[in-house]
Amino acid sequence: MSPTPIKHYLQFSDLSADEYEYLLDRARILKAKFKNYETWHPLHDRTLAMIFEKNSTRTRLSFEAGIHQLGGHAVFLNTRDSQLGRGEPIEDAAQVISRMVDIIMIRTFGQEIIDRFAKHSRVPVINGLTNEYHPCQVLADVFTYIEQRGTIAGKTVAWIGDANNMAYTWIQAAERLDFTFHFSAPPGYQLDPAMVPDWAASRVKVFDNPLDACQGAHLVTTDVWTSMGFEAENDARKRAFKDWMVTTAMMDRAADDALFMHCLPAHRGEEVEAAVIDGPRSVVWEEAENRLHVQKALMEYLLCGRY
């Protein structure tokens, strides 16, 4: 085991390709231990603080179960029930909370909130989701693809839907892990140029037609049309995205061995056909489970370094 200095995981680009190679292999090992009921407690007596401003099922369950399986325990903090929800400065909260726990996961709205928190934290901070990025989910998706098909390097990932936190995280992953990213969304929901790095021109291709975006893709993925915090736009988004539902016809344009993923929860008949998400090319349940294993690998790495 080689200890590391304090390192945060706030967006996908925070780790190098070499670190991802280690993490993904470590996730494979930890998943095997889990399946074999093998006890592994490198985080014995360590405490994870989980701070939620946005509610979640999968994020809370995967982090809470994950730290427990590694020998530690979790403390759940909802901002509505803490001083953070009563106007305590983020910087002050970071100083206090990070003196009482060993690692912190935050699921919130603006990326600047978690960036400010991490700047004043004495322990590692993990982005459980922000409006801008969702690195833990893309890490799980990448692991799922590798588990099913081998390396993701040189492959094509097609994103059909909103320019949201998942799309921007996939762009960062394309650079780190050497694959191509296809993006398609209706007018008015395109990528924000300020969120797309200069190097992206060599990795990212934007398509007006979602069928064209799926052509030859090895992975087709999507998300809900209306993310949390945008509920007032729901009706307008349903109208705008009606031709961006992932269909069997789109999957038929993809590579013969293409997979379908969705970070869930899904709305069948909106962003994806039931025949696709419930069909043989879908790996959404493996994808959901793998949040648990990649996050265990991540917490182990941030606290213990490499084994």
From Swiss-Prot:
SUPFAM superfamilies: Aspartate/ornithine carbamoyltransferase (SSF53671). Pathway: Amino-acid biosynthesis; L-arginine biosynthesis; L-arginine from L-ornithine and carbamoyl phosphate: step 1/3. It catalyses: carbamoyl phosphate + L-ornithine = L-citrulline + phosphate + H(+). Carbamoyl phosphate binds at S56, T57, R58, T59, Q83, R107, H134, P135, C136, Q137, C263, L264, R291. GO terms for biological process: arginine biosynthetic process via ornithine; citrulline biosynthetic process; L-arginine biosynthetic process. InterPro entries: Asp/Orn_carbamoyltranf_P-bd (IPR006132), Asp/Orn_carbamoylTrfase (IPR006130), Asp/Orn_carbamoylTrfase_sf (IPR036901), Asp_carbamoyltransf_Asp/Orn-bd (IPR006131), Orn/put_carbamltrans (IPR002292), OTCase_ArgI (IPR024904). The keyword Amino-acid biosynthesis applies. GO terms for molecular function: amino acid binding; ornithine carbamoyltransferase activity. It is found in: Cytoplasm. Its main location: cytoplasm. Signal peptide: none annotated. L-ornithine binds at N165, D223, S227, M228. Keywords: Amino-acid biosynthesis, Arginine biosynthesis, Cytoplasm, Transferase. One of its GO terms (cellular component) is cytoplasm. HAMAP family: OTCase. NCBIfam families: orni_carb_tr, PRK00779.1. Belongs to the aspartate/ornithine carbamoyltransferase superfamily. OTCase family. Reversibly catalyzes the transfer of the carbamoyl group from carbamoyl phosphate (CP) to the N(epsilon) atom of ornithine (ORN) to produce L-citrulline. This is Ornithine carbamoyltransferase. The lineage of its organism: Bacteria, Pseudomonadati, Pseudomonadota, Betaproteobacteria, Burkholderiales.
